[in-house]
Each structure stands twice: as C-alpha cells, then as structure tokens.
C-alpha cells in the first residue's frame, strides 16, 4: 500500500479486512521503495475531494508521478493499471512501455459493462455446449 500518511488506508479497513483475513501487506510512503517488488502497480490520481484544504492537496498532488525513470527499478513483467482518466500521475512517456496496461484495462472494462447490461436485459445469446 503506497500513499502519503494523510491518505493511508483507514485503520478499520486494515483491521477488519487485512488483519482479520490474515492478508499480508506492507505500507510505505515512497513509490520507489516498493517498485522492485510489485507484480501490479494500480494507480489513481490524488483526489482533491479527499482534502480539507486546497493547500494540503497542492502539497501532495505531485508526490506520486510515475515516470520512465521510476520504472527502471520495476520488474519487466509488472503491470501498470489505472482507471483513467489521469491528471498528471502517469507521465505520457510511460504509455509506450509494454507494462502500461491501462488502455487495455479500460477497453476490457467497457466490454464487461456491455455484457452485464445485456445480461440484465435478458439479451444474452444461447450458448451451445
């Protein structure tokens, strides 16, 4: 779990889910510290609406920007995911990296939503076995 202290996963989530279910996890405030160990890097933007003051948001907004330089420490088979749209948290230069899977992620998400809507409407084709 990588985040500034101000945005860390709430204690009740860590206690009631991670600890209770014995899910191992590690917390850090530095992306660079975790990068060599990651199978998947799931990023989101630093969300302005989570801050009480504009000053706090501006102070932390650019803390976690993924660049080509930071990727040098990452595994060659790591996947980078992001729900999009992005603000500035992933450099556009990262888009050409083979580990950048966020465009495929968004495309597959669209197909899944289409399939779910068809199922809800009862419009799924019969599947022959």
What are these regions (language model features)?
Residues 6, 32, 48, 85-86, ...:
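Short, glycine-/Ser/Thr-/acidic-enriched flexible segments
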Residues 69-77:
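Short, conserved loop/helix-junction motifs that constitute active-site signature segments
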Residues 43-44, 83:
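Short, well-ordered coil/turn residues at beta-beta hairpins
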Residues 1-43:
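Glycine-rich phosphate/diphosphate-binding loop of Rossmann-like nucleotide-binding domains
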Residues 13-14, 53-55, 91-94:
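Short amphipathic alpha-helical segments
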